[in-house]
Amino acid sequence: MTGIDDTPPAWDERTQLTTFLDYARGTARAKCKGVSAEDACKALLPSSPLMTMSGLINHLRWVEYYWFQVVFLGEADEGPWTDEDPDREMRVAVDFPLSQLLDEYAEQSARHRELVAGQALDAKAERAVRDGLHVDLRWILLHLTEETARHNGHLDILRELLDGTTS
């Protein structure tokens, strides 16, 4: 994981975008270190019964799949969600060991690193996201960094509630 303190004074745009996404991904994985399979499935926030550490990791994995493979590449959407259960990736995560979910997230991230390396940042997504808008790869990288960082905050809260870990 790249730390904030080892950021060089000058990076090109691609390096900035990919490094900060990788930092956020690494933070998500680090928050799960040492968490038992049982604890990873605990919903500790009464107002968010689907929010578990396993659910968040599975969500992050499938969010990357959706934005890179479905929106950017235009592949068929084979994600776990349905119209009847749009949050299914959060719900089904408790049926899998956290270690498996982390491995799948790492594999997905590695595939996407390769994809991003071979594309221009201004390459447009095959699918429109709304109102006919085709976002570019740059936007997708920024969005995934924001989404991952936001959920890292949720992982922070869950981890602290589980065992008091705050770093």
Segments from the language model and where they lie:
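Short, contiguous alpha-helical
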Residues: 2-8, 14-87, 127-167
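Acidic/histidine-rich alpha-helical segments that form the ligand environment
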Residues: 88-125, 138-144
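Long, acidic, intrinsically disordered low-complexity segments
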Residues: 1-9, 97-103
